[in-house]
Amino acid sequence: MDHSIGGRNCQSGGTTASAPRSTGSDEFPSKLRETCHACSLSKVRCSKEKPSCSRCAKRGVPCEYIVTKRPGRKRDPTKSAGLTSSHCKSFDAATAAPNNTNANCAWLEDVLLTDMGGSGGGSTGHAYLDSTQTDTGSPMLWPLMANDGADIAGDMSDFLMPLITPLSCTFTARTPDFLSAAAEFSAPISPPNNHDDKNNNQSMQDGSNVMQLLLPDDVHGGHAAENAAQEAPSVDFHSSCSSRSLSSVPESFLSSKIASNSDFGSASSSCECLIKALDIMAKVSSTDLAVTPDTPSTRRNSVQDEAVVAGHDQTSPLLHATFMANKQTIEALSNMLHGSCQENVYLLTCMSMIVFKVLRRYEMAAGQSISAGVLDMHEAARPRHGDLDRDSLRRAAAQLVLGELHLVQQLVSRLSRRLQLSMDKTPNDGADSELSDSTLATRVFTLDEDDKADTSAFSAATLSQMDHDLRKGLARLSSNIINMLRRL
């Protein structure tokens, strides 16, 4: 029996697809692929040059044109004979020179040699190929032997390189690092050790943690250890892959992102002012200077700091602390009104609430001066300062608080003007009640590009009521103090 490769290939019509069939008919004609094997796996355009395309020649990889089979009409027997003779010649050339990697039938030769060597006979090899076929006429699946897996695994990195090339022109040099980076994410994330605590804390500071910005220092200071323990795994995950990821991203991509983010410069400055206002609001709400406990130590300090009412200023530590805190708050709000974010309606609303807190502090400071505890404290100071009556103490405290209200009046006047400007850019509630939703949406989003006020969340009636309450609160406090001075 003749087991020569060329003879068997020529008898089967130049293809291995018809060899296992008992009919021997050329039902599914076969031919070489127009695209080489490397370009076909990479899903890229091939120049179709033979014996080696330009892409494979540039990369230095073997260029192989494998046999393909496509269902269709039967070919003309004369053309099939010509195709068979051409396949036989090319196959014989590949057998005579097995080291020629540019041969067209090199891949087919390896499969046939593996089939004959593993089976030991033609019939066994045909049976092995027959098991991979179906009776429905579907294309044959080529079997992969054990030694073929190593070759495919070795060439996998070369086939994946064109898929990564569009990301960056310099990314192909780092392809092995990119392929090996998957091992870093396969293992479970372990808690960070003590050596990485400094890096983790730096990463947490660079992140946008809203809770750390909104809460005051004394509130989130006690929970710093708990927050660090909860955020440690995520920080460790990002720090482990940050160096490799940043090295793989092109500089042009990063520069474009930075340029696009620079368009939000005005929005970020407005956000910074709003964050400062929220911080002031949290501190004003958390620390109440007007209701500090009346301890013996504070009582002695108050007695030592008091002065005689007649012809001298009288300031207790309670009033002094209240005045200093309110002055700092008013100064901070005044600086915000001079900034570029002075037309932000959210900032104006937050500043209005802070002004209400400041007025409440002055009211409580004036009320504490005539409370029972403070009166007892002043009674203890009588041996030192002489006969001090309660009316004199009330009058002195009321005059001090009344003298500080001009600072609040200036701030309220400026804040009221800003609220009036925001109301002019906001639709009226009465007119909007008769309009449709589409009309309202069009009116909200047709503001000029230069307008920095975001009035989509507050109506004109809300801003007007806020302005009215600010002026009314200041007038009520002044009126109460003046009426108390008239009664004394």
From Swiss-Prot:
Assigned keywords, A-Z: DNA-binding, Metal-binding, Nucleus, Transcription, Transcription regulation
Residues covered by region (Disordered): 1-29
Superkingdom of origin: Eukaryota
GO MF annotation: an example: DNA-binding transcription factor activity, RNA polymerase II-specific
Compartments it resides in: Nucleus
GO CC terms of this entry: nucleus
Keyword Metal-binding: yes
DNA-binding region: 36-63
Induction: Expression correlates with the formation of the sclerotia and thus the pigment production.
Biased composition (Polar residues): 9-25
One biological process term in Gene Ontology: aflatoxin biosynthetic process
Reported function: Transcription factor; part of the gene cluster responsible for the typical purple-black color of the ergot sclerotia. The ergochrome gene cluster produces several ergot pigments including the yellow ergochrome secalonic acid and its derivatives, as well as the red anthraquinones endocrocin and clavorubin.
Name recorded for this polypeptide: Ergochrome gene cluster transcriptional regulator CPUR_05433
Protein species of origin: Claviceps purpurea (strain 20.1)
